[in-house]
C-alpha cells in the first residue's frame, strides 16, 4: 500500500518476501497489486478482491498520517469498525519515550484497533496489524516497514495461518542436468 511505491520511491521487497512465505505454506498467490493512498480506490480493490480470494494480505498504510488509510478502509469493507485501545496507546507512548520523542495527536490513530477483528501486536514498532474475517474470507494487515512486517509475519501471522490449514504442501526444486 502506498503512493510512494507507485512512484518508484521505494522498492516493494515485502511482496517478494510474502510470495515466498505464502508459497511455503501451500497458499497460491493469485495476484500482487499496489494501491495508492486513495480510500475510494482502495475500497473498490478490497471489495473486488475479497469476492474472489479467501485471503488478502496487506502491508503498509497503518501509520499515523492522513494518507495511511488501510486499516479503516479494510475494516469497513469487512463490516467492522475501529475503537481506541488504551493498552495499545500506552505501548505507543512508551515506545516514543524510549526513543526520546513525544507523541503527537496523529499518533493516536495507530491505537485504533478492530472491534470484531483481531489486533496483531507489533513488538518492533508502533503500528499494530489487524486480522479481519467475514464469511470465511480473511484480510491480514501488517506494517509496511520490512523489518516490522517480517517480524509480525514470523511471530503472529504465519502461526495463525498454520492453525487454519488442514494440510501442508511441501515442495522441492530438482535441477536436472
Give the positions of each predicted feature:
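Glycine-rich phosphate/diphosphate-binding loop of Rossmann-like nucleotide-binding domains
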Residues: 1-33
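Short glycine-rich anion-binding loops that position phosphate/pyrophosphate groups of nucleotides
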Residues: 3-4, 61-64, 144-147
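Short beta->alpha junction loops
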Residues: 31-41
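Proline/glycine-rich low-complexity loops and linkers
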Residues: 41, 68-164
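Short, well-structured alpha-helical segments in soluble
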Residues: 44-52
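Glycine-rich phosphate-binding loop
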Residues: 51-77
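Short glycine-/aliphatic-rich beta-strand segments at the starts of folded cytosolic domains
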Residues: 164-177
Amino acid at each position: 500500500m502506498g503512493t510512494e511505491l507507485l512512484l518508484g520511491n521505494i522498492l516493494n521487497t515485502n511482496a517478494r518476501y510474502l510470495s515466498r512465505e505464502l508459497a511455503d505454506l501451500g497458499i497460491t498467490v493469485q495476484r500482487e497489486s499496489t494501491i495508492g493512498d486513495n480510500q475510494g480506490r482502495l475500497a473498490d480493490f478490497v471489495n473486488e478482491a475479497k469476492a474472489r480470494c479467501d485471503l488478502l494480505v496487506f502491508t503498509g498504510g497503518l501509520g499515523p498520517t492522513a494518507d495511511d488509510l488501510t486499516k479503516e478502509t479494510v475494516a469497513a469493507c469487512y463490516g467492522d469498525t475501529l475503537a481506541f485501545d488504551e493498552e495499545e496507546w500506552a505501548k505507543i507512548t512508551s515506545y516514543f519515550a524510549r526513543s526520546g520523542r513525544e507523541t503527537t495527536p496523529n499518533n493516536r490513530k495507530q491505537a485504533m484497533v478492530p472491534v470484531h477483528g483481531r489486533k496483531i501486536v507489533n513488538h518492533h514498532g508502533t503500528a499494530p496489524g489487524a486480522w479481519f474475517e467475514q464469511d470465511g474470507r480473511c484480510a491480514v494487515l501488517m506494517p509496511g516497514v520490512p523489518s516490522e512486517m517480517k517480524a509480525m509475519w514470523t511471530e503472529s501471522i504465519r502461526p495463525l495461518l498454520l492453525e487454519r490449514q488442514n494440510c501442508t504442501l511441501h515442495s522441492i526444486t530438482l535441477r536436472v542436468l
